[in-house]
Regions:
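Noncatalytic modules at the cell exterior or secretory-pathway interfaces
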Residues: 76, 115-133
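Hydrophobic beta-strand segments within beta-rich accessory/binding domains
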Residues: 65-83, 123-125
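Extracellular and analogous surface-interaction loops
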Residues: 58, 65-73, 113-118
Length: 158
C-alpha cells in the first residue's frame, strides 16, 4: 500500500503532466491561429482572373503565406518568378487546399490544374534552403483562377 506522501507525489506528478500537455496543446493552437491571421489575402480586381503579389524575404525570414478563396472545379495556375533587384529568389511554392491536401514545387509554375475543393486556399512561398546565401530573396507570384464557366471544359471529368 502506498503511503500518503507517495500518493500525494503521484497526484502532483499527474497534475503537472496534465498541465504541461494542456499548455503545449494551447500553444500549438495559438501558433496555428496566428499563422492564419498573418496570411496576406490575395485580392482579385472585379472581373479579373489573375492577381500578382510581390515580396521580399529578409535574410532571417524563411517563408510568407497568402490566401484566396476559390470553388471546386475552377482551373488555376500559380507561377513564381524572380523579383527584379534581388540577388536571391524565393522560388518554393506550395498550395495548401481546403481538403487538407497540398501541391507545389520549386520555381516557375508551381500549380496548374482543377482545384479540388471549395474554400480557402493558402499559398506558402519560401526560399530554397539548399540554394540560399542568406540574402534577401524576392519573388513575384501570379495567381490565375478561371471562372467556373471558363473552367468547365478543362475540369469536366474532375
Amino acid at each position: 500500500m502506498l503511503s500518503i506522501n507517495n500518493r500525494t507525489a503521484l497526484s502532483s506528478t499527474r497534475a503537472l503532466k496534465t498541465l504541461l500537455l494542456s499548455a503545449a496543446l494551447i500553444s500549438v493552437g495559438a501558433n496555428s491561429a496566428l499563422a492564419k491571421t498573418s496570411d496576406t489575402t490575395i485580392h482579385f480586381a472585379k472581373g479579373a482572373i489573375s492577381s500578382v503579389v510581390t515580396g521580399k524575404l529578409k535574410p532571417n525570414e524563411q517563408e510568407r503565406w497568402y490566401r484566396f478563396n476559390a470553388a471546386a472545379a475552377q482551373y488555376a495556375i500559380i507561377n513564381i518568378a524572380p523579383l527584379t533587384g534581388t540577388s536571391e529568389t524565393a522560388n518554393v511554392g506550395v498550395l495548401h487546399m481546403p481538403n487538407g491536401k497540398y501541391d507545389g514545387t520549386k520555381g516557375g509554375i508551381i500549380y496548374q490544374g482543377c482545384l479540388p475543393a471549395t474554400g480557402e486556399y493558402r499559398l506558402r512561398i519560401a526560399r530554397n534552403l539548399m540554394a540560399t546565401h542568406g540574402e534577401t530573396a524576392g519573388y513575384k507570384a501570379e495567381v490565375m483562377v478561371l471562372p467556373k464557366f471558363a473552367s468547365k471544359s478543362l475540369c469536366a471529368d474532375k
